[in-house]
């Protein structure tokens, strides 16, 4: 059982994991009059009345113009910045756009992001650099980053994770969240269904690599999962209770990442497929889908790997490469290599623990309780109208397979993808999993 969201906000508590957890987010306003509450809530957060409002051209129309009007009527000084699209359908969160925004953000008392993933991350990142608090007005239930202190930008072509700051407040209007473009909601569902797999990966890192683990954070959305995992038809029907549960699950996941200080509670090997597709697009200019929609496919893929791993009684380590595929990564090779090289010592430790046999069964016992089977995840996404095939994200089989065969190289933290390579399941399983689970 978890605390309700209101009690969790602006709290510090001692956890059974041995750590003291702090939730710096002070306000969550999920109400039809959330825009009207902006001036009063922001006044309680900061002393001054200068706000930088950041949006894109779509979210400006949805809520940005009205937010600016309400704040100015309440005698706030509003400086508005519209983040430009990159020519492929929307803005991107990368080092170039960050520099662009940083150069244009004036001195202010607080920054307000109006939008979803990219706008939220760029505002969070830039406000953190300028030592200014920020709040976010969410326009769709599209990802778990609203309440997270992390940002996942592309820097020098590589998708990485950096620490920034959590918002002081989150605002959302239920009718806007429910009626948001449906592909955005399905992106949020893709991010949410990843949680059981990412938690299994967290257990893997805890047992094999000594990473700290918090059961409270691992179970933080358990009571919400039935609303969308067991009743995905309610998502496609846009039932308010289901959409609210999905939005809350995303908020809780972000809070878990904030209080732990890493992305471990909500991001594991299942996210790497999406990150790799994004990185490939940054090189060749091909279009990619929304992060969460790609994560949905990555979650099915990782779940299918777990299904194979669970059948292994006595693990045997196979040779693994201590280098990356430089030809494939091209201009990104140097940065990818730096990440991968940092993982090699941990891969050696994993092999040592697999050889001694003492860690394998505790891992299986715990991970089997967590990981959902690929059939359940695929059924959930399909029934909800979310992407569950490579065609559904506008990707070819060849491109998806290429991403699957290289995704283990991009991050220094080991995941179930690395374990599948060590156990000899990869690379041969990649094409088989795509054909069985991600084709139709």
Language-model features: locations:
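ATP/NTP phosphate-donor binding region
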Residues: 1-110
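C-terminal charged capping/lid subdomain of soluble metabolic enzymes
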Residues: 2-15, 192, 308-440
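Solvent-exposed alpha-helices and their adjacent loops that cap or buttress functional pockets
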Residues: 20-22, 45-46, 103-106, 127, ...
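Gly/Ser/Thr-rich loops at beta-strand to alpha-helix junctions
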Residues: 32-35, 57-64, 115-120, 141-142, ...
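Non-transmembrane, aqueous-exposed alpha-helical and coiled segments at domain scale
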Residues: 89, 94-107, 141, 260, ...
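A short, small-residue-rich loop immediately preceding and capping a beta-strand
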Residues: 104-126, 130-140
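A glycine/threonine-rich phosphate-anchoring loop and its flanking beta-alpha core
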Residues: 125-227
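Active-site segments that bind and position negatively charged phosphate/pyrophosphate groups
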Residues: 220-368, 372-376
């Amino acid at each position: 059982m978890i605390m309700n969201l209101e009690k969790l906000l602006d709290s510090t508590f001692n956890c059974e994991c041995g750590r003291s957890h702090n939730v710096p987010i002070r306000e969550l306003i999920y109400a039809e009059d959330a825009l009207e509450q902006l001036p009063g809530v922001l006044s309680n957060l900061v002393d001054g009345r200068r706000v930088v409002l950041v949006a894109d051209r779509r979210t400006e129309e949805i809520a940005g113009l009205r937010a600016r009007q309400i704040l100015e009527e309440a005698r706030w000084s509003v400086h508005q910045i519209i983040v430009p699209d990159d020519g492929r359908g929307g803005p991107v969160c990368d080092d170039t756009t960050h520099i662009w925004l940083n150069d244009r953000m004036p001195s202010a008392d607080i920054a307000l992001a109006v939008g979803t993933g990219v706008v939220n991350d760029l505002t969070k990142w830039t406000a953190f650099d300028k030592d200014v608090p920020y709040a976010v007005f969410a326009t769709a239930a599209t990802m778990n980053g609203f309440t997270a202190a992390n940002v996942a930008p592309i820097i020098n072509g590589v998708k990485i994770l950096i620490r920034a700051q959590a918002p002081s407040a989150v605002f959302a209007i239920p009718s806007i969240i429910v009626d948001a473009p449906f592909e955005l909601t399905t992106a949020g569902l893709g991010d949410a269904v990843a949680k059981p797999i990412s938690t299994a990966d967290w257990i893997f890192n805890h047992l094999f690599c000594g990473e700290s683990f918090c059961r409270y954070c691992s179970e933080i959305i358990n009571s919400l999962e039935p609303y969308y995992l067991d009743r995905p038809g309610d998502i496609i029907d846009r039932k308010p209770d289901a959409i609210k549960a999905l939005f809350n699950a995303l908020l809780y996941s972000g809070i878990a990442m904030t209080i732990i200080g890493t992305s471990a509670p909500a991001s594991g090997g299942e996210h790497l497929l999406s990150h790799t597709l994004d990185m490939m697009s940054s090189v060749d200019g091909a279009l990619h889908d929304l992060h969460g929609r790609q994560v949905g496919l990555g979650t099915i893929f990782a779940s299918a790997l777990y299904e194979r791993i669970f059948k292994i009684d006595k693990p045997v380590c196979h040779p693994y490469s201590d280098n990356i595929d430089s030809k494939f990564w091209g201009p990104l090779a140097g940065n990818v290599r730096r990440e991968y090289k940092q993982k090699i010592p941990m891969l050696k430790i994993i092999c040592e623990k697999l050889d001694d046999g003492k860690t394998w069964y505790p891992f299986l016992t715990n991970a089997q309780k967590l990981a959902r089977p690929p059939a359940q995840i695929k059924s959930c996404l399909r029934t909800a109208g979310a992407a569950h095939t490579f065609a559904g994200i506008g990707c070819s089989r060849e491109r998806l397979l290429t991403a699957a065969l290289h995704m283990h190289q991009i991050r220094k933290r080991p995941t179930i993808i690395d374990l599948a390579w060590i156990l000899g399941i990869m690379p041969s399983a990649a094409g088989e999993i795509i054909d069985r689970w991600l084709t139709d």
